[in-house]
Amino acid sequence: MQRPENEPQIKAFFNAKEAQARQLVSMEKKELPPEIWPYFEAGKKGDWATVTNLYGKMASRSHQFDGNKSYDERMLTMAWNPINETDRFYLQCTQPDSNLVLKFGEEVMRLIPPGSIYFGDTDTGRFVPTALCRDHAKGDPFFVITQHAMADGLYLAYLRTMFEPRIYIPTLRDSQQAFDEYIQDAVKRMQQGKLQPGEDLKKEGNRVAVSGMTAIMAINSLISKVMFERNPNHQFYVCEGFPNAWIYPYAEPHGLIIKINRQKLDELNSEMIQKDRDYWHKQITPLIGDWIKEETTMTEICDFVEKVYVREDFTGFKGETNFTRMATFWRKVPAYNSASANWSKCRSAIAGIYVWRINDCAEQIRAIYRLSAEEMNKKQADIHRLTAEQQRYIKEADFAYRQAFALNPSSPEAVYRYASLLTSMGRQEEALQMARVAKKLNPALITLEADLIKAKLQTNPVITVTP
């Protein structure tokens, strides 16, 4: 087994997390699975084959993975979190593009002020900064948390042992209130036939059973909002995993990640937008070259994808070949782990902020048109302002999605989200052009191509694509 280049760093992380795990189990005083301490010992020694073997045995019995048929009560321990954090960091460091993955993590660290609360909601965005902290358990230099485990009571208990009383961690009561709030809203939508894909609700007597990724993420989101509201003296940042509706009114592009402002923003001003553009130009240039401009066409982007990603013809290419090659290995390396997928996902997330602003402007304009004629006439200046603002956001979302697609054209998220924007603007031909080249890298995108063709044949083409 090949040794990671930063092996001393990984060993040190195992050592720190073993000490934390021992402290956690001393509080729990319960029977533990036999693999825990040999796992940490193997990590400290650099015995990576044993680390992988023991982690696999524990993970197969952990509560974390749905549909686990060999569930082990002994795995219900807070020590599972240090185990998971060490293994996930080790995996990040053993990829062929691990130097770029670590560079991504280091950039996230640079962007976040000390004392902030940071939601790391992708594997790289969570586990690499966790390991790069001076002391993760002490929130030094900032508090690394994931929204995606907020509904897990064991994870919240783990956070409390580390971070209270310095920051407020949601309680079991907060979790229950979030669950009840979600159920109340979801039942109403179920009766109206408005459940979203990934929401599965079933009535079982007097109770409602919930399953599905969308439902779980919605509950996690409500709990994380409590955390935001109860920690008013801390800055918040997020590396987006799934779009989170409550964040958008507060969201501002902040380099690779998103800043969650304390107050809702009336707009994203020209200074914020220019700063975002300048930052991403500097990020993208060493990775895939300095060629994407505002006037760059979809044909030019698809030609680049065909040449560099599909044919791997690097003639005249001025970027990181390892970056682009890993984007084509989506079968072997999960897309959320590769460096190209991480940069692309972050750019898509920021494009999503602009899309939310587009829709918000549209809603404000619709609200004005619902007024009486007399009141509407008084709002003509607002209509012109909102229309101009909306066009500005459309331009930025379009450009950001083009960059996201060029960074990883095999990414379903980048392709689907951009296709949604293009079709909403009547640019189905461009969406279809993108889907046709993307499916060469990821055959799963054939479905999108079929949907786009079907929509194009309709008299009034309408398509809804969900990331």
Give residue spans per PLM region.
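ER/secretory pathway lumenal C-terminal domains and tails of membrane proteins involved
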Residues: 1-121, 125-407, 413-414, 423, ...
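TPR/TPR-like alpha-solenoid repeats
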Residues: 41, 353, 421, 452-460
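Canonical tetratricopeptide repeat
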Residues: 349, 417, 451-452
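Terminal, low-structured helical/coil segments at or just beyond the last alpha-helical repeat
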Residues: 367, 371-374, 432-467
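Extended alpha-helical scaffolding segments
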Residues: 416-417, 428
